[in-house]
Every structure is written in C-alpha cells, then in structure tokens.
Amino acid sequence: MDKENFTRLRGELFCDHPLARYTSWRVGGKAERFYRPADLFDLQDFLTQLPSDEPLTWLGLGSNVLIRDGGIKGTVILTLNRLKELSVVNSQLVFREKSGTEDFFSGNGKTIIRAEAGVTCAKLAKFCVSQGLEDGAFFAGIPGTVGGALAMNAGAFGGETWRTVIGVETMNHQGEILKRTPDEFKIHYRQVEGLENQFFIAGYFCFNHGDPDKAKTAINALLKKRNLSQPIGKYSCGSVFRNPPGDYAARLIESAGLKGKSIGNAEVSEKHANFILNKGNASAADIEALIHYVAQHVSQIHGIQLVKEVNIIGRS
C-alpha cells in the first residue's frame, strides 16, 4: 500500500521506513508504512482510506518508547510538529452534546489552553510561562509530546498531566473526532484506562492566572534541577521504571549496585540510575535485555518488582 492507493493526501507516506531517528534512544527497526500528516484534517483523510484492520502505532517525540529491532507491523503515524496547534480558548465553551443537551465545561475564571498531540511538553510549558501560568511549568520536565503525556499521565517535579486536564479530543480508526471529559477515563499513576482503540489528538488544560515573571522563574528553577540530576543530551527514554509506592526506582537501582551496568552498548546511567543510555550503537535488544536484568536484580535484592514506565513495542 503506497501513496498511489490514496487520494487527497497532503502529508508524507513512506514504506519500510527506518524509525530509529524518531526515538530518543535512537534504536529500532522499520515501519511497514510511515505517515507524517500535514495537519489534523489531513490525518482524518488518511485514516478514512486505511483498511479497518490496519494496525496503527502513534509516535510523538519517541521518548517513552522502545521499538524493537524487527520494526513495527502496519502504519506508524508521526504527530510531532504536525498536530501542532496551541492556543488559549474561551473560558466557557460547548464541549460536547449528550442526549440533545449541551454540556459545558468552564475554567471558572482560569485560563484554558488547547494543545494538539504533536506539541512538545516543553513548548506547552513555555507557552504557559508566556501567559503567566506558573502551574503549567512542570511540563518542561516531561521529555515528550502532549499526546504521549495524555496517554500515560506523564508527570515531573510533582505535577501530573491529568490534574490539569478538563477535556480531550480523541480520534478513532475511522478518523472520527470525539470530545471527551476526564470522568470517562480511569486515571492512575503513569497509566490511563478507557481509550479503547482511540488516540489522543488534543487536550484542554486549565491553569491559574499568575505573574509571567514568577512563571519564568519557576520554569528556570525546574530546568536547573533537572539538568543537575539527569543525563541531559544523552540518548535515553527518560525514566525507565515507575516509582513504587513510597520509594524511588532510581534509589532501588542504585542501592542494588547497578549504576554503570552495561549489556552491549546499553548502560545504566551513572548520573541517574532510572535512566538507561545508548552509548552510541546499542541495539534495542541490548536495551531490553538491560531493562529485564535491572528489574530482576532489584527484585532479588529488595524484593520489589519494578514496573516499566517505558512502552516496549514491535517485533524482535
């Protein structure tokens, strides 16, 4: 299935397309098909023309995913810098209709921002700062896009994505857009249930008004803290494991003596033990083997089973 099988497309469609450069680990095989939509409406056109049983995988910044060396079956859709609309919206608007009645959500005097899935969390944080919204600064510590943050309830510096969400837009396999509210989902620590073969394409975030200078100071302080504690600029996915209740994955890994542990060219970071680095030419298999080794070793030493935060996908 190539571009000749489609009409009206304005995006870019590739077959057998290498995926490593689209992930922050810089590893992984090829996608059978890879689509980079021009915008949200082009994505709708594309999806309406796909077979109903076509497997779909969505990528943003590729920062919380390990793509295996055998690649991905079906179609990979890249949202980064394609679903990129970011704006302040009316503080009270019609969000959806139910049984002929209009449901409203309101910011109660706060600021509501609509951000599409391909907007990076760093860009969302900077936009919040420009609007004087200090409580949105934590997004600067999330190394991904809005779509990924919504899908996993990403968080940083004590903030969590879904604490700020008052509504979302999702898209199904047929390209239909649905508007949904948080009460339709089960929100957990680094996990969201209730998507059911749909994909997040935009979020509505509600923030308190504040002083732009204070917001800028807050984001700078958070970024300084991150740069001191994390291996910024290295090939990693961010945190590999979720923090267990009452503890930290990094502390458990470090106390198990695993800092600097390597398999192939994958290595547990010396700076932050919950980061695994690609030292230059690691394979996805190297990284996955090290993830399993760390989890097994921590379980043996501490009796705690670490749960992966990173999503491992594709064929071995």
Swiss-Prot record:
The active site is at 190, 239 (proton donor), 309. It catalyses: UDP-N-acetyl-alpha-D-muramate + NADP(+) = UDP-N-acetyl-3-O-(1-carboxyvinyl)-alpha-D-glucosamine + NADPH + H(+). GO terms for biological process: cell division; cell wall organization; peptidoglycan biosynthetic process; regulation of cell shape. The keyword Cytoplasm applies. The gene is murB. It comes from Coxiella burnetii (strain CbuG_Q212). Belongs to the MurB family. This is UDP-N-acetylenolpyruvoylglucosamine reductase. SUPFAM superfamilies: FAD-binding/transporter-associated domain-like, Uridine diphospho-N-Acetylenolpyruvylglucosamine reductase, MurB, C-terminal domain. The keyword Cell division applies.
